[in-house]
Regions:
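Outer-membrane beta-barrel translocator/receptor signature
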Residues: 145-152, 160-209, 235-238, 251
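Short acidic/polar hinge/loop motifs at secondary-structure boundaries
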Residues: 114-141
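Face-selective signature of the C-terminal outer-membrane beta-barrel domain
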Residues: 237-263, 287-427, 431-455, 501-513, ...
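Short, acidic, small-residue-rich periplasmic hinge/interaction motif at the N-terminus
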Residues: 39-73, 97-98, 138
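N-terminal periplasmic accessory domains that precede
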Residues: 50, 80-85, 99-102, 135, ...
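Extracytoplasmic beta-strand/coil segments of soluble accessory domains associated
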Residues: 81-116
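Surface-exposed extracellular loop regions of Gram-negative outer-membrane beta-barrel proteins
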Residues: 420, 446-493, 511-529, 647-663
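C-terminal beta-signal and adjacent terminal beta-strands/loops
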Residues: 633-709
Length: 709
């Protein structure tokens, strides 16, 4: 801690010092040393002549750790994801290729801004220089965090009045896409008003999709099909949202509304088809002409009452979203095959939580929630039916949080959801469940932290599977819904360990087991001369995975290095019936060259294929990807030049499916998987005085569909 002392001070000078002054000088130095060790929540440098004392950049809080970004990290980061990557938060990883933040065990991360949940684009609109500190929370007990397993809460600088206007432009070359947005925030007293408008387009004219499929109708009737497809896809999207938030000592209230419009007017393909085998169709060329559009308005409110009697708290929220989706496909291979859907979706949700203290600092939280998903879909073409799905949930939750000490706490929750749903004119199928989890958070000293989590839950149903549609897709394939599917159950157990001995180094290790019971997978079978893809429950899917993620910061924070090593063993006991191993390597590095320029790079490589969850039933492997960013910052102006897939001109996704009646392999190469260059520029214009907190607009609509895939 005592960095240096002037070399010009000679030992002989001390011989003539007054004893009292020498004693006083010694006491001051010892006090400074003690103060530096005690300041675990500050990154400031205190300079007294030649003595330099530096504190740590992280400290423990309830359910997690606070990380304080360095001045250099905030200065060079172009957005929040970039800031988190440079901070190298133990347990988090930022994928530069997908611009996504996830846990090191591949769990979803939910963002909050000053304790209020935020959507992705809202986080994107924030300025890194306004971040005071970052709270990384694991299964936080506060009901406003909705029992999320991983939460990043961004605590922002304060505004008493004023705010800023932000504009950002992102344009890609070779891969033709662009994203243009503007956000504004105004603070006045206890009110914060925010608005955002964003436009996006993507024109991809050279998507390559090649397949090889074997259809086994019987021992004597086997057909092989090879396709070479060139696809053109043009997409555009517009989003706007407004938000008002009121904050006082006792009340937090937010109200927001938004609208999103998305359109894909062009989604066409030219397909060369080659058949071999008995009773095979003739070879030829197929054409696909498809288009789709959808709109999504929403409204949302949230309140939080604090300082109620007995130090209790009351939380609640209500939201409503509406989706309208239209899509059509015309497939021509000899005779045309037309399919279209028109869909309306209604998504109401309301919940309330009451939290109250028990013994000492322990809390009990009770929650009641009602949510519904109402789908009304009209199919035309090869299936002319109207499909209705009503999926309702009523939840009752009780959570208890126990604090053993300042370093150790535990939580347990019991949840009883009652799911009652109906398909078309059938009666309601009512199924109660018992879900729950237990979690342990703890620290051993100041350098070691442990997190353990185990849960069992009912998985949400996939609306597109629950119908009675039988549809012909092409000359040999069809798709069928299944209204009688069992909901899936999910169980997992996680152990996570983090070692943070010094500011510039951390090591995170995770081991997790997951199981999906009654897994939903495709079942291909012959029916009426077609090979039909049915959706069925079959067996359990299990995965055991482990990851090790060291992080190192050198040269006073100028050079940051992180690398994730990943291993997984995956098994399926159903009709998919496989056992495979998967390995991954994901390094990241950033370097601040000077005050204005910095460079960062991220690489990802999977060494084997892995299982694609969600009812697709395929195994897949992605090409490796090296992305390099060169960034420039000056005041409120930021610019970033990025090169995606530096090592590989054409990126790809390969997938495989094997069953008794169908074997297939696919190769898909899209412009955004391969090499392209993009330029991002961002500028903010400040007005007023900063003394309250940052942007809080968010788009809270939920995009849902029941259309058969």
């Amino acid at each position: 801690m005592l960095a240096c002392v002037h070399n010009t001070v000679k030992l002989k000078n001390f011989r003539y010092m007054n004893k009292k002054r020498l004693l006083l000088f010694t006491i001051v130095l010892l006090s400074l040393d003690y103060y530096a060790k005690a300041q675990t929540d500050s990154i400031k440098n205190y300079k007294l002549n030649e003595v330099v004392v530096e504190g740590t950049r992280n400290y423990a809080i309830a359910d997690g750790v606070v990380y304080i970004p360095s001045k250099e990290a905030k200065q060079h980061a172009i957005n929040i994801n970039d800031l988190l990557a440079r901070m190298m938060v133990a347990g988090l990883r930022v994928d530069l290729g997908s611009n996504k933040v996830e846990t090191t065990y591949q769990g979803e991360v939910h963002f909050y801004i000053d304790g209020v949940e935020a959507q992705d684009w809202e986080v994107k609109a924030l300025r890194p220089k306004d971040v005071l500190h970052v709270e990384y929370l694991k299964s936080p007990a506060d009901p406003k965090y909705k029992n999320y397993q991983a939460v990043v809460n961004l605590v922002m600088k304060k505004y008493k009045y004023g705010g800023y206007v932000l504009g950002e432009v992102n344009q890609s070359f070779v891969y033709n896409s662009g994203n243009y947005g503007a956000a504004a925030k105004v603070n006045t007293g206890k009110w914060t008003l925010t608005g955002l408008a964003e436009a996006y387009y993507r024109n991809a004219d050279d998507i390559t999709h090649n397949t090889g499929t074997q259809y086994i109708f019987s021992k004597d009737n086997i057909i092989d099909k090879l396709t070479e497809e060139t696809q053109r896809e043009h997409t555009k999207m517009f989003t706007t949202a407004v938000n008002a938030r009121y904050i006082s000592d006792k009340l937090t209230f937010t109200a927001s509304a938004g609208y999103r419009y998305e359109s894909t007017p062009v989604n066409n393909s030219d397909i060369n088809i080659t058949y071999t085998g008995n009773n095979a169709p003739d070879n030829g060329k197929a054409l696909t002409e498809a288009s789709s559009k959808g709109m999504l308005p929403y409204i949302n409110t949230y309140f939080q009452l604090s300082k109620l009697p007995r130090n209790s708290m009351l939380y609640g929220a209500a939201s409503f979203s509406y989706n309208h989706n239209d899509a059509s496909t015309l497939y021509t291979f000899g005779s045309p095959i037309f399919n279209a859907t028109e869909e309306d979706v209604y998504l109401p949700d309301v919940w309330m939580s009451y939290a109250f203290p028990l013994y000492k600092q322990n809390y009990m939280t009770v929650t009641a929630e009602y949510k519904s998903e109402i789908f009304n879909t009209l199919y035309t073409g090869t299936d002319n039916t109207r499909q209705k799905l009503i999926n309702n949930y009523v939840y009752a939750r009780v959570r208890y949080n126990h604090k053993f000490s300042d370093n150790w706490s535990a939580s347990a929750q019991i949840e009883v959801p009652v799911n009652f749903y109906k398909v078309n004119d059938d009666g309601y199928d009512t199924k109660p469940y018992v879900n729950g989890f237990v979690v342990m958070n703890g620290r051993i000293g100041k350098k070691h932290s442990l997190y353990a989590y185990a849960q069992i839950m009912q998985m949400p149903i996939t609306p597109s599977f629950y119908n009675t549609v039988v549809r012909q897709d092409n000359e040999i394939e069809g798709t069928k819904g299944n209204a009688g599917l069992k909901p899936q159950r999910y169980a997992s157990a996680l152990m996570s360990y983090a070692w943070m001995p010094i500011n510039g180094f951390s090591l995170n290790a995770d081991v997790i087991w997951e199981e999906i019971m009654h897994d939903i997978v495709p079942l291909w079978h012959a029916e009426n001369g077609l090979m039909i893809k049915d959706i069925v429950n079959s067996g359990n899917y299990d995965i055991i995975s482990a990851s090790l993620t060291p992080s190192l910061s050198l040269a006073g924070g100028k050079l940051n290095i992180q690398a994730k090593l990943y291993y997984a063993h995956e098994m399926h006991s159903g009709i998919r019936n496989f056992s495979l191993n998967n390995y991954g390597l994901y390094p990241y590095v950033s370097y601040n060259m000077n005050k204005n320029f910095s460079v960062s790079a991220g690489y990802g490589k999977n060494f084997n294929k892995g299982f694609m969850r969600g009812g697709y039933g395929t195994t897949a492997q992605f090409s490796d990807n090296l992305k390099v960013n060169l960034q420039y910052t000056a005041g409120n102006f930021y610019a970033m030049l990025s090169v995606n897939s530096v090592l590989r001109k054409h990126g790809w996704v390969k997938s495989w499916f094997d069953s008794d009646n169908l074997h297939s392999s696919e190769y898909l190469s899209r412009p955004w998987d391969g090499r392209y260059v993009s330029l991002t520029m961002r500028y903010t214009l400040d007005f007023g005085r900063k003394t309250d907190h940052g942007n809080n607009a968010r788009f809270e609509g939920s995009a849902k569909t029941s259309v058969l895939k």
